[in-house]
Amino acid sequence: MINMNNTEIGYGNHALTPPIDGCFVAGSLTAIIGANGAGKSTLLKTLAGLQPAVAGQITFTGGRVPQMAYLPQQAELDRQFPIVVQDVVAMGCWPQSGLLGGINHQSRQRINQALSAVGMQDMARQPVGELSGGQLQRVLFARLLVQQAQLILLDEPFTGIDSQTVGLLLEVIHQLHTEGRTIIAVLHDMSMVEEHFPHALWLTPQGHCWQSAEQVLVQWHHSHGSSCSFSSRPSILRAINL
């Protein structure tokens, strides 16, 4: 479990969010939503330990930070770096083998299985600079699979990629969730949140709403001039424009 106690997220002494209180339950699948500049990506970076909180605390149950995998937005990645697909995926083995530890037979099997899971097994020797956006995202998800992390942080993982890849990666996310991983994703597509994410954290300049996705989205749609009704599946909400 990740606990946030009066935590303000931002840069330096400048907070992007009011104090946040709540927790990400172990094994949960949570979407972070909010307007541009609300602090969504900054929150992920703070959870990943890449920058400190402006105020308050972030603590982990048992006092130990779990093994985590962080996937930033594609715009933050250097696609010109001369590396091939299988070597990118092999980076997921580093937490176990170390940077200079080499890839053993067991790790090689994990890499091949991960590439197969995302449909990229035939492009293992392809330079990443020659991949489409969707293909690159599949490779990065394969690296996540190899990492075997308990905490997975995804920053806009479906932006700018084709619908077939989106569907495949959602299957990967659901499989990881079934295995008990804790997954936190920044998303902009409310229909995707409604259909696939049981929990949501909505960040606004005035505060935050952190409940089940159903409860959060009722408030989100209300604030945007729409309302929600339950579909035939109790856990799914649909927006009805007024």
Where are these regions (language model features)?
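Conserved ABC ATPase "signature" region
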Residues: 105-123
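H-loop (His-switch) and adjacent beta-strand-loop-beta switch element
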Residues: 197-214
